[in-house]
């Protein structure tokens, strides 16, 4: 797993990265944190991003995030660095033009809608399991 993030306050905490690397090593994997999105995307089979803005962010917070993260936006140019059969993922909702370009999220490599559908199925299965299938009509 390769993580692309600006240095400083945006970077994951070193103890979290170390713990993740311990877990990854058990399966032959590793976690790598890079500050260059192009290096991180090169040869990737999947690109996953999330929304940058949170509800309640002040205008100053929004400006700071855009300034720090704009070079990490997923664009068609960035996707060209990935493998031929790579996919783009996003947990939604997405802000087109911020963390992802419209042509990427709506493009042929995007699996965000399939991802959202499977999330619904997963949640339904989890709820069924947690209620032991004892909801009305399922006894």
List PLM regions with ranges.
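Glycine/threonine-rich flexible loop motifs
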Residues: 51-72
């Amino acid at each position: 797993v390769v993580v692309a993030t600006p240095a400083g306050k945006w970077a994951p905490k070193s103890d979290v990265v170390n713990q993740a690397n311990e877990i990854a090593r058990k399966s032959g994997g590793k976690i790598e944190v890079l500050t260059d999105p192009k290096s991180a995307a090169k040869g990737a089979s999947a690109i996953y991003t999330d929304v940058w803005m949170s509800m309640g962010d002040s205008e100053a917070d929004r400006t700071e995030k855009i300034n720090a993260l704009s070079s990490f936006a997923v664009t068609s140019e960035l996707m060209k660095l990935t493998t031929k059969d790579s996919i783009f993922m996003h947990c939604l909702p997405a802000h087109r033009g911020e963390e992802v370009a419209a042509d990427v999220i709506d493009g042929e490599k995007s699996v965000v809608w399939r991802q959202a559908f499977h999330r619904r199925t997963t949640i339904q299965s989890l709820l069924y399991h947690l209620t032991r299938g004892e909801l009305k009509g399922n006894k």
